[in-house]
């Protein structure tokens, strides 16, 4: 359940621990699955800020590509 995963990650992120970037990345993925693009991007950005080599960088770029594709389609109708 995506909602439950987000709630669990919210709790985990209240603590300080090594590898916190991975939790932000996972929460970003959960938000992406809900098509909550802004929250997904925010969480990917947090992960990238903590770890520039995080896979969140690729995920961030993918979401931006998706959003840019949809916005272009809006103007071409």
Describe each model-derived feature in a short phrase.
Residues 15-16, 49-50:
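Structural marker of alpha-solenoid helical repeat scaffolds
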